[in-house]
Amino acid sequence: MASESGKLWGGRFVGTVDPIMEKFNSSITYDRHLWEADVQGSKAYSRGLEKAGLLTKAEMDQILHGLDKVAEEWAQGTFKLNPNDEDIHTANERRLKELIGETAGKLHTGRSRNDQVVTDLRLWMRQNCSMLSALLCELIRTMVDRAEAERDVLFPGYTHLQRAQPIRWSHWILSHAVALTRDSERLLEVRKRINVLPLGSGAIAGNPLGVDRELLRAELDFGAITLNSMDATSERDFVAEFLFWASLCMTHLSRMAEDLILYGTKEFSFVQLSDAYSTGSSLMPQKKNPDSLELIRSKAGRVFGRCAGLLMTLKGLPSTYNKDLQEDKEAVFEVSDTMSAVLQVATGVISTLQIHRENMGRALSPDMLATDLAYYLVRKGMPFRQAHEASGKAVFMAETKGVALNQLSLQELQTISPLFSGDVSHVWDYGHSVEQYEALGGTARSSVDWQIGQLRALLRAQQTESPPHASPK
């Protein structure tokens, strides 16, 4: 049990800890987020102790009742922290002793804060991953719904930020939705590796008192049990994986935000953000700034920093638990909060975005059909490399004459290749252009419909695979 100072350690120490060191060592300001998981883990462990004969039934019931009271105080906001509560485990155990007396001292039998904290963190992250998964799926669903509703809108596709080929607006939306679907799949995979029980590993060597880890696993609804006690208390792969997942997801969201910021400028005027997701200027009254998208873009860097910071912490550690690992929780909590906010804002932006179809259509230009002109010659039997060169000559001729590509006469085109004939006029139809890309994954209407169907099926499958995780007993 806690020493007279309220610490969970003591006996071999003399004197008091420097107040600056007290503050430096404390983590209660942020690991208090784990209060519910800490109570859940302690309740399961008390049942394990009772089964092992280390608690009587009456003692277990007393502890369980006390833990329920601790949880109630946290939930109602009445839990009072003590200056000596260096972390959530100290705080909860101290309060439990105040409520039920010395019996509380038996709860920590055979348990270390090393296996306790990593169990708490896994419980918290498992639940949080379910929440983030639901938010991410809602964003993808919103994007798919929008793509389905606006399938007939055409606009320029860009490579190197240069106009490339006509595509469907839906094709652009779906390109980002597909990337986010991979993020959704990765999150479920990360959660599976989070869902492994370390409790019962002790500080390093394991549990010598006959505690049934399979019972603990079932009580806390974990999918598996850790294989090695040294690894169980010190590995933070699951934290690094989560932070990397968030970094990659933010990469995708940042790229989408960058596209929309560009498309929303007066120079493009393809889209307009809702006032609900924009702000103004304190000096220039005409300004409508895409702050929602800019913050999504900037917060990507913040998340990357947390991921890199944790990896730098982990790479130099010797085996088993070290206090450095206290740094993992702040990173997890901050990134989780950031991801929750970003996903909700992104969903709001997409669902309320206004598109300017006319401007999108006006931005299409005949030079974007140069590739189609080459394909026209390919269909006439010309090898693609020759067709590419012939189309390039047509582009050069149009530029030299100061006219649009589709303004070249048939006679002028035939000076480049005799394969050009009257049906070349079909090349200059933007609708015809996009419809030729019928191969799966392309921008033709049939292919876009197929993509929408595939994404809806993936969302249904992921919803089945990732039901809301029930709280442990």
Curated annotation (Swiss-Prot):
UniProt site (Increases basicity of active site His): 294
Q: Which InterPro entries match?
A: Arg_succ_lyase_C, Argininosuccinate_lyase, Fumarase/histidase_N, Fumarate_lyase_CS, Fumarate_lyase_fam, Fumarate_lyase_N, L-Aspartase-like
Which pathway does UniProt place it in? Amino-acid biosynthesis; L-arginine biosynthesis; L-arginine from L-ornithine and carbamoyl phosphate: step 3/3; Nitrogen metabolism; urea cycle; L-arginine and fumarate from (N(omega)-L-arginino)succinate: step 1/1
List-wise, which residues carry N6-acetyllysine?
A: 7, 69, 288
Query: For this protein, what is the EC number?
Result: 4.3.2.1
Q: Which residues cross the membrane?
A: none
CDD domains noted in UniProt: Argininosuccinate_lyase
Q: Which GO MF term does the entry hold, naming one?
A: argininosuccinate lyase activity
Modified sites of kind N-acetylalanine: 2
The alphabetized UniProt keywords are: Acetylation, Amino-acid biosynthesis, Arginine biosynthesis, Lyase, Urea cycle
Its EC top class is lyase
Among the GO biological process terms of this entry, one is: arginine biosynthetic process via ornithine
Which is an annotated Pfam family here? ASL_C2
Q: Does the keyword Lyase apply?
A: yes
Any known activators or inhibitors?
Enzyme activity is regulated by acetylation.
Q: Name one GO cellular component term.
A: cytosol
Q: Please report the PTM annotation for this entry.
A: Acetylation modifies enzyme activity in response to alterations of extracellular nutrient availability. Acetylation increased with trichostin A (TSA) or with nicotinamide (NAM). Glucose increases acetylation by about a factor of 3 with decreasing enzyme activity. Acetylation on Lys-288 is decreased on the addition of extra amino acids resulting in activation of enzyme activity.
Provide the function of this protein. Answer: Catalyzes the reversible cleavage of L-argininosuccinate to fumarate and L-arginine, an intermediate step reaction in the urea cycle mostly providing for hepatic nitrogen detoxification into excretable urea as well as de novo L-arginine synthesis in nonhepatic tissues. Essential regulator of intracellular and extracellular L-arginine pools.
Q: How does it assemble?
A: Homotetramer. Forms tissue-specific complexes with ASS1, SLC7A1, HSP90AA1 and nitric oxide synthase NOS1, NOS2 or NOS3; the complex maintenance is independent of ASL catalytic function.
Name the chain's protein.
Argininosuccinate lyase
Origin species, per record, is Bos taurus
